[in-house]
Design a protein with these regions (language model features):
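Charged, amphipathic alpha-helical segments and their flanking helix caps
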Residues: 1-25, 43-147
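A short, hydrophobic beta-strand-centered structural micro-motif
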Residues: 30-39
Length: 147
């Protein structure tokens, strides 16, 4: 799951100048880190044949380490635009059916959202860390044959 999202984000135009890795970002500007925060089962149903259907949400965090010299409002605006461009791209790719598929059933109901982009911290050395929450909702079917 994490590798699918990593490969997907690696295509994002907003990340072309960023070195993306699995794990935490930084400390060098121009780096980003992606990791999974976990999976939550939102709903579970079992039919008479014993097939279990789960609606799940996987949550990921993407942290970006970008340059932000103290008092530089132009760079702050560029960084904010960078986050917004990434969120918009994820929404467009999902709407076009080009987002990664995480479940094994009902792909038409799958969603992928990038949201809550924010500045986490900035230091006097001219570096800022931004975070973005990425949420995937998908459906998983389990049968006796499902490993």
């Amino acid at each position: 799951m994490l590798q699918k999202l990593y490969a997907f984000l690696a295509r994002a135009p907003a990340l072309t100048e960023i070195t993306l890795a699995v794990g935490d970002a930084g400390p060098a500007p121009g780096t980003a880190g992606l990791w999974c925060k976990g999976v939550t089962v939102l709903e579970q149903r079992e039919n008479l044949l014993g097939i279990v259907r789960q609606r799940c949400r996987a949550e990921f965090t993407l942290r970006l380490c970008l340059p932000l010299p103290p008092g530089d409002s132009a760079t702050a605006a560029e960084n904010a635009a960078h986050l917004l461009a990434l969120q918009t791209w994820v929404a467009a790719e999902c709407a076009a059916g080009r987002a990664p598929v995480f479940g094994n059933a009902d792909p038409a109901r799958e969603t992928l959202r990038a949201e809550q982009g924010k500045l986490e911290r900035a230091d006097a050395g001219g570096t800022a860390v931004y975070s973005l929450r990425i949420r995937a909702e998908y459906t998983q079917l389990y049968t006796e044959e499902t490993p």
